[in-house]
Amino acid sequence: MRKDGARLALPLFDPRHDPGPDFAALVSRDAARTVPTSGDGSLGAQVPHGTTIAALRFAGGVVIAGDRRATEGNFIANRTIEKVFPADRFSGVGIAGAAGPAVEMVRIFQVQLEHYEKVEGKALSLEGKANQLAQMIRQNLPLAMQGLVVMPLFAGWDAERSEGRIFTFDVAGGRYEEVAYYAIGSGGRDARATLKLGWRPGLDEAGAVHLAVQALYEAAQEDAATGGPDALRGIFPVVAVIDREGYRRIDDARLEEIAVELDQAVRERGARR
């Protein structure tokens, strides 16, 4: 019922053109003008880029974390951008690459999962969600060829397996599962090195959160495009835990405590010159 009292009609589709639970197909069919199209020229250096995202499994789920810095070439475009989002109640996605298209992709992905659940009456499986995201990355390939690369890291709780899982993607939409941890973005290599040294089977939630923050902290020491914890400005990474209870974000007070511990460890061992 609309505000003017008129009833909303149930949309009917020809069986040959019924989009079903695919929200992207519905938009393309009935609102094609709202679907982004590719332009001409290389745009990669002109837009803000998100940098480092890390994820790791622990005994009861998965942790996903992202720094807060966005860059335009050699400049810091934003110090407080958020790159980790809930996809739905039991999954989350972190973004690296061109910030604008990446955030827009996440929003469409969130709506797609909600649309599917409303149409089908049940949530998509975790692998199904990863496949859906892979398809969206594949559709972004024309923009990626112009420099607007979107590179997500997807993680969530698999109720069928009763475990956390991590999925990575390539620019063409290839989907790959990581068994323990992974990191993407400009600081991804340094973050992965820290995760490799610190991860172990049976890691608990507190240890996983600490290791995720440490991975971003160490990446920021080596990669200028990755922002480390900034207590002066009150800026800390976005860190989320996803387990059988769902997605929840770790509060900044806990992250500040971890950052202080990491600073103290650097002072004790001596800063690298």
Curated annotation (Swiss-Prot):
GO biological process, one term: proteasomal protein catabolic process
Molecular function, one GO term: threonine-type endopeptidase activity
Enzyme active site: T51 (nucleophile)
Location, primary (coarse class): cytoplasm
Ion transport in keyword set: no
Cellular component terms (Gene Ontology): cytoplasm; proteasome core complex, beta-subunit complex
Pathway annotation: Protein degradation; proteasomal Pup-dependent pathway
Compartments in which it is found: Cytoplasm
PROSITE patterns referenced in this protein's UniProt entry, alphabetically: PROTEASOME_BETA_2
Keywords: Autocatalytic cleavage, Cytoplasm, Hydrolase, Protease, Proteasome, Threonine protease, Zymogen
Enzyme class: hydrolase
Activity regulation information from UniProt: The formation of the proteasomal ATPase ARC-20S proteasome complex, likely via the docking of the C-termini of ARC into the intersubunit pockets in the alpha-rings, may trigger opening of the gate for substrate entry. Interconversion between the open-gate and close-gate conformations leads to a dynamic regulation of the 20S proteasome proteolysis activity.
Gene3D superfamilies referenced in this protein's UniProt entry, alphabetically: Glutamine Phosphoribosylpyrophosphate, subunit 1, domain 1 (3.60.20.10)
Propiece residue ranges: 1-50
EC number: 3.4.25.1
Function according to Swiss-Prot or TrEMBL: Component of the proteasome core, a large protease complex with broad specificity involved in protein degradation.
Binding partners and assembly: The 20S proteasome core is composed of 14 alpha and 14 beta subunits that assemble into four stacked heptameric rings, resulting in a barrel-shaped structure. The two inner rings, each composed of seven catalytic beta subunits, are sandwiched by two outer rings, each composed of seven alpha subunits. The catalytic chamber with the active sites is on the inside of the barrel. Has a gated structure, the ends of the cylinder being occluded by the N-termini of the alpha-subunits. Is capped by the proteasome-associated ATPase, ARC.
Official protein name in the record: Proteasome subunit beta
Species in which this protein is naturally found: Acidimicrobium ferrooxidans (strain DSM 10331 / JCM 15462 / NBRC 103882 / ICP)
Species classification: Bacteria, Bacillati, Actinomycetota, Acidimicrobiia, Acidimicrobiales
Gene symbol of the encoding locus: prcB
